UniProtKB/Swiss-Prot annotation:
Enzyme class: transferase
This protein's record includes keyword DNA-binding: no
Protein name, UniProt field: L-tyrosine:2-oxoglutarate aminotransferase atrD
UniProt keyword terms in alphabetical order: Aminotransferase, Pyridoxal phosphate, Transferase
High-level lineage: Eukaryota, Fungi, Dikarya, Basidiomycota, Agaricomycotina
Required co-factors: pyridoxal 5'-phosphate
Family stated for the protein in its record: Belongs to the class-I pyridoxal-phosphate-dependent aminotransferase family.
pH dependence: Optimum pH is 9.0.
């Protein structure tokens, strides 16, 4: 679906790479839905009489029109105005028998699995302006969870190994386990996935001992869930280079991409070219934007910038992979729901916000979440940091803060020396906390500290105190391939907290958290 638009990012020159060998057995043998194939072929003839499909006739739909009342986007901060009830509104109408961006007779009928053209073209235009992907196409999904599970089926066979961050969103990685896919964790730090560890895993892989070499990397590059880290441009380039060298498909799951903080957009660009161009200059470069091989499958979602219940997102990939995803959708979930597509068509259409209006909303939304992040950090510094029991990285994007609990200062923290199996709190402790990979290499069989036990006790303490955060163990990818140099249990001294709640929730929650830490560490 080529779209000629102006972009702040130069279009890279694609190179022809055959990636068909990455397809799963299911994807290779899947045949197009034969009825859908006939229906698609018929679309080339305008006004054709449809006597083939079993479509309920639009005159019998019990609906004639819908109105969507949305913010008008007047003023510099529309999200603040909408939140406080001072915003003017804009009424978007979608009709069955009157002119609309997307007629309800079309939206509510059976459609193509890839989605209706009005929505796909609007999203392709937006993607071209922000990412400038070479020779890529867009198809719709029912949100990123749907898109990701379809990608697992597209690329994964039983006993395949996929790569991911060592702490990641377990609800999604668990979906792959049911397909017989095994996860290989890659180390992370405050800046996200470490390209040198990715390269080490691939370089040292022994197919005789470990099975087939991993050929897919699943990553959340912006506000990685749960760590909140964002991968820098330099790291992205190095990761893509490793992917090219070792022939890895990159699934770029980026639902928090538009929630970037501390951005300084160019006011001259904003005045001359609008929000989309101004935002494209300061948003992080995606893996998609540098994909000259066609090995990136990017997943975007409206869940974080509009509402999660909309259950609509979009997948950007090479036409080859898009065609395979289309066949999978036509034989499974079918087309995305018409109500959501009608809403998006009007919102992004000529009488609605358009792409530029969406970017204005996104910029304003990020400012509001940035305010809440700053409040979280301020309260954390005032209440939690003075205890000395925990610290936190300030996230650049997204909704999460990754809190490190300093268990090394807990009176019951112990380290089992690898040679004797005894407990020792001496010099070994310093070695574990400073460089867990060095000591952990001796103890690949399992954790050498009681981190998991203490974190479990802390979680119970938090619940009893009236606050809940998600422990790192929930997101930990246990290495069963033998690639990891140190047990992840010894690095699971973290909690994931969110700052998307109300100001009162943030203040009260962190106050309780600080008190619970003091009691847990026997400081009170």
């Amino acid at each position: 679906m080529p779209v000629a638009v102006e972009s702040a990012i130069p279009y890279p020159t694609p190179r022809k790479v055959d990636l068909a060998h990455h397809l799963s057995t299911e994807a290779r043998i899947r045949q197009p839905n034969p009825i859908k194939s006939v229906w698609k072929a018929a679309q080339v003839r305008p006004g054709i009489i449809n006597m083939g499909n079993g479509d309920p006739h639009h005159t019998l739909y019990p609906i004639s029109s819908m109105n969507f009342i949305v913010p008008s986007l007047e003023g510099d901060h529309p999200v603040e105005a909408w939140r406080t009830g001072t915003s003017k509104t804009l009424v978007l109408s979608s009709h069955k028998d009157a002119p609309s961006t997307l007629s309800l007779r079309t939206a509510f009928a059976y459609g193509a699995g890839a989605g209706l053209p009005a929505v796909r073209e609007a999203l392709a235009d937006l993607g071209a302006r922000i990412h400038a992907p070479p020779n890529h196409t867009v198809c719709l999904s029912l949100g990123n969870a749907d898109a990701l599970t379809k990608c697992f089926r597209l690329f994964g066979d039983p006993d395949d190994s996929f790569l991911c961050e060592e702490f990641t969103f377990s609800a999604m990685t668990n979906a792959a386990l049911a397909l017989g896919i095994r996860w290989v964790p890659v180390r992370v730090d405050g800046g996200g996935l470490l390209p040198e560890d990715l390269e080490r895993v691939m370089r040292c892989w022994d197919e005789k001992k470990q099975g087939k070499r991993p050929h897919v990397l699943y990553t959340v590059p912006c506000s990685q869930n749960p760590t909140g880290s964002t991968i820098s441009l330099e790291r992205r380039r190095r990761i893509y280079e490793v992917a090219h060298i070792y022939d890895i498909i990159i699934i770029e799951d980026d639902p928090y991409y538009f929630l970037q903080y501390d951005l300084q957009i160019n006011q001259n660009t904003l005045k001359e070219h609008g929000y989309t161009r101004a935002m494209s200059e300061v948003l992080p470069r995606s893996f998609l934007s540098m994909d000259i091989d066609g090995r990136v499958v990017r997943l975007d979602s409206f869940s974080k910038v509009l509402a999660p219940g909309i259950r609509l997102g979009w997948i950007t990939s090479s036409p080859f992979f898009a065609d395979k995803l289309d066949m999978l959708t036509d034989s499974s979930t079918q087309h995305p729901h018409g109500l959501g597509q009608a809403y998006l068509a009007e919102l992004l259409g000529p009488t609605g916000w358009g792409a530029d209006g969406l970017m204005k909303w996104v910029h304003s939304l990020a400012r509001e979440y940035e305010r809440r992040r700053d409040l979280f950090v301020s309260v954390f510094d005032a209440k939690v940091a003075p205890t000395g029991c925990a610290s936190a990285e300030v996230p650049q994007s997204g909704m999460f803060v990754w809190i490190q609990v300093h268990l090394e200062t807990h009176p019951r923290f112990v380290v089992r020396t690898p040679d004797s199996g005894s407990d020792d709190e001496g010099d070994v402790l310093g070695a574990v906390m400073a460089a867990p990979g060095v000591l952990g290499e001796v103890a690949r069989g399992g954790p050498i500290t009681n981190t998991e036990q203490l974190m479990s006790e802390l979680l119970r303490k938090l619940v009893e105190s009236g606050v809940i955060m998600i422990p790192a163990s929930t997101f930990a990818i246990v290495d069963r391939s033998g690639s990891t140099l140190s047990p992840i249990g010894d690095r699971a001294n973290y909690l994931r907290a969110t700052f998307v709640g109300t100001d009162e929730t943030i203040r009260d929650g962190l106050t309780i958290f600080a008190q619970a830490l003091e009691e847990f560490f026997n400081l009170k």
